[in-house]
């Protein structure tokens, strides 16, 4: 029955449509649509090791030196001192600040928007609800958040994540149908591991992902092999998965470029997590250098973006 309802949802009119540019992220610069690479500070947690973790300033310094346009912070529960420190770090290192936070109830709408405005973020990335939020409550929460952000003039992206209302493809497609202005920060890795997708996509998954890719105005870079949520894309053993993710990322970029307008930016965030996202060896150390992975992912993302620009004839190549 569930599969029948899912296939019916995929055929309903109006489910897939090009996103209007007014919902895209913008940074106020009058320029062709362009890429906006972001590195999550959390991606450097416990780096280079749990016992010798870089300071927050060192992390931001390294992120700026690597050529990212912004560093991303978790703003939920942040203090005035946190906001002041992040703003100062951004100014000192010539880099912008992106905002990620949690929305569990309508009372969370205003603080989330205030955080994005305070930090001047080009997006508000929201982790919405939990895996136990009912479909009806989730839809109401998403609809309310979309309306609140539209009124406030803040570009909203809903992160696709395990343990949230977007934890599975079936429900995420249903929300996309129910809330036409819903836009996603699409992290494919969570869907691949939640659905144990280790090989080529089946027709149901292909159809569902196509919907979410058309609705994505931001992407997260993490590679899953269908069993682990995070594996090293440089490992030849995962070449097929790397190529599959790269193709899906580029397709999403091309979908976005076809309707983007001047001043629009496409955030692509790198955020490889510390253990237990990262895999540990017998010596208790990560089996791969996570920062080197993330810098290499940035290079891959830029190559894919420039290919998408060339193939669509839209947007601006990324040259930084």
Each language-model region and where it sits:
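Alpha-helical scaffolding segments of alpha/beta enzyme cores, especially the outer helices
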Residues: 58-62, 81-88, 92, 111-118, ...
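Hydrophobic faces of well-ordered beta-strands that scaffold small-molecule active sites
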Residues: 33-44, 71-73, 95-101, 124-126, ...
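Active-site acidic/histidine proton-transfer and metal-coordination neighborhood
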Residues: 93-184
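N-terminal pre-domain/capping segments
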Residues: 19-117, 121, 299-320
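Acidic-and-aromatic substrate-binding clefts and catalytic sites of carbohydrate-active enzymes
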Residues: 47-53, 70-84, 101-110, 131-137, ...
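Sec-dependent N-terminal signal peptides
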Residues: 4-12
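Histidine-acidic metal/acid-base catalytic patches
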Residues: 19-37, 53-62, 178-183, 192-320
């Amino acid at each position: 029955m569930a599969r029948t309802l899912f296939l019916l949802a995929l055929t309903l009119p109006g489910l897939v449509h090009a996103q209007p540019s007014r919902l895209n992220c913008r940074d106020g610069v009058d320029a062709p649509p362009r890429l906006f690479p972001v590195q999550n500070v959390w991606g450097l947690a416990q780096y280079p090791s749990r016992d010798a973790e870089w300071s927050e300033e060192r992390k931001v310094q390294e992120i700026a030196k690597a050529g990212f346009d912004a560093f991303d912070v978790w703003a939920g529960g942040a203090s005035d001192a946190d906001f002041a420190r992040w703003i100062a770090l951004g100014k000192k290192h010539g880099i912008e600040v992106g905002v990620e936070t949690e929305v569990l109830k309508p009372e969370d709408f205003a603080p989330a928007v205030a955080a994005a405005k305070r930090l001047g973020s080009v997006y508000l990335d929201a982790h919405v609800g939990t895996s136990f939020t009912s479909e009806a409550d989730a839809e109401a929460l998403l609809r309310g958040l979309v309306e609140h952000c539209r009124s406030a003039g803040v570009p909203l992206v809903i992160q696709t994540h395990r343990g949230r209302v977007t934890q599975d493809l079936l429900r995420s497609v249903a929300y996309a149908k129910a809330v036409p202005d819903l836009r996603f920060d699409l992290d494919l890795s969570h869907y691949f591991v939640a659905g144990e997708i280790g090989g080529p996509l089946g027709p149901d998954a292909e159809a569902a992902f196509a919907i979410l890719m058309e609705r994505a105005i931001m992407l997260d870079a993490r590679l899953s092999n269908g069993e682990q949520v995070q594996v090293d894309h440089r490992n030849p053993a995962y070449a097929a998965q790397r190529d599959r993710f790269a193709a899906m990322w580029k397709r999403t970029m091309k979908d976005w470029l076809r309707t983007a307008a001047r001043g629009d930016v496409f955030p692509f965030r790198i955020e490889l997590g510390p253990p237990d996202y990262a895999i540990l060896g017998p010596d208790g150390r990560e089996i791969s250098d996570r920062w080197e992975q993330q810098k290499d992912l940035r290079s891959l993302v830029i190559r894919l973006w420039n290919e998408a620009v060339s193939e669509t004839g839209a947007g601006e190549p990324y040259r930084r």
